[in-house]
UniProtKB/Swiss-Prot annotation:
Transmembrane segments: none annotated. Keywords: Cytoplasm, DNA integration, DNA recombination, DNA-binding. This is Tyrosine recombinase XerA. InterPro entries: CB, DNA_brk_join_enz, Integrase-like_cat_sf, Integrase_catalytic, Integrase_recombinase_N, Integrase_SAM-like_N, Tyrosine_recombinase_XerCD, XerA. Site-specific tyrosine recombinase, which acts by catalyzing the cutting and rejoining of the recombining DNA molecules. Gene3D superfamilies: 1.10.150.130, Intergrase catalytic core (1.10.443.10). It comes from the Archaea. Pfam families: Phage_int_SAM_1, Phage_integrase. Residues 5-82 form the Core-binding (CB) domain. Residues 98-274 form the Tyr recombinase domain. The gene is xerA. It comes from Pyrococcus furiosus (strain ATCC 43587 / DSM 3638 / JCM 8422 / Vc1). GO terms for molecular function: DNA binding; tyrosine-based site-specific recombinase activity.
Length: 286
């Protein structure tokens, strides 16, 4: 019983430490979850024990990306305990850089078309994710006061890394938001709320996933919130938008994170060159 109480105290203090470090609520939730599992199994705050824990998770089928997240959580915990040398000994596993999967513009259109006209909230969720490149957590945390209707901007509060950013809203999307709000009858400060709950809590990421899964099935498309974000970036790049602007819109701290989309469009560029067929009359007969 005493051990359980001590663990709770450590987790609470660790969460406070992460908050002071500027970590987002989602990061704090994940880090404390993995630390609780680490402590529950009786591991000590050493790199050696951390490796044993990671090996156990890998054997359970955890992906390299998930393992990487656990490493980040444990490194933060070691630093919290003042064990900087142990933190340094932990190495992040190499994550293979895979091309993000994005929908085609035709698939996005098909997805929107299967949403019933009376499901105004659901339609707006899809339009916002695709039309602004928001992360699902950012969408759920969006408040009505974060939207500047006069100037046509929305402000993302405390995005990844705890940074705010401003995103322009296209006029058609702004009109959709106004139409949606005119039909709202609750007084929640959040732009999106749960429709099935009496107290109208803010929308959860789980609900967004469920909504997309439902309409994706109807459209015959596998779609996730992150895929819509990828699609936003890819389609912007394909239309000639500067990659640095896309970086700002996505809220990427590093340009290298955004540059993966230049690889996504390689196929698109190849097809364009082949369609142009500039050399047909020059070497076609050889």
């Amino acid at each position: 019983m005493r051990e359980k109480t001590l663990r709770s105290e450590v987790l609470e203090e660790f969460a406070t430490y992460l908050e002071l470090e500027g970590k987002s609520k989602n990061t704090i939730r994940m880090y404390t979850y993995f630390l609780s599992k680490f402590l529950e199994e009786g591991y000590s705050p050493t790199a050696r024990d951390a490796l044993r824990f990671l090996a156990k998770l890998r054997a359970k089928g955890y992906s390299i990306r998930s393992i990487n997240l656990v490493v980040q959580a444990l490194k933060a915990y070691f630093k919290f305990e003042g064990l900087n040398e142990e933190a340094e000994r932990l190495r992040n596993p190499k994550i293979p850089k895979t091309l993000p999967k994005s929908l085609t513009e035709e698939e996005v259109k098909k997805l929107i078309e299967v949403i019933p006209k009376d499901k105004i909230r659901d339609r707006l969720i899809v339009l916002l994710l695709y039309g602004t490149g928001l992360r699902v957590s950012e969408l759920c945390n969006l408040k009505i006061e974060d939207i500047n209707f006069e100037k046509g901007f929305l402000t993302v509060r405390g995005g990844k890394g705890g940074k705010d950013r401003t995103i322009p809203i296209p006029q058609p999307l702004l009109t959709e938001i106004k139409n949606y709000l005119r039909r709202r009858t609750d007084d929640s400060p959040y732009l999106f709320v749960e429709s099935r709950r009496k107290n109208k809590e803010k929308l959860s990421p789980k609900t967004v996933w469920r909504i997309l899964k439902e309409y994706g099935r109807k459209a015959g498309i596998k779609v996730t919130p992150h895929q819509l974000r990828h699609s936003f970036a890819t389609h912007m790049l394909e239309r000639g938008i500067d990659i640095r602007i896309i970086q700002e819109l996505l809220g990427h701290a590093s340009l290298s994170t955004t540059q993966i989309y230049t690889r996504v469009t390689a196929k698109h560029l190849k097809e364009a060159v082949e369609r142009a067929n500039l050399l047909e009359n020059l070497i076609g007969g050889e």
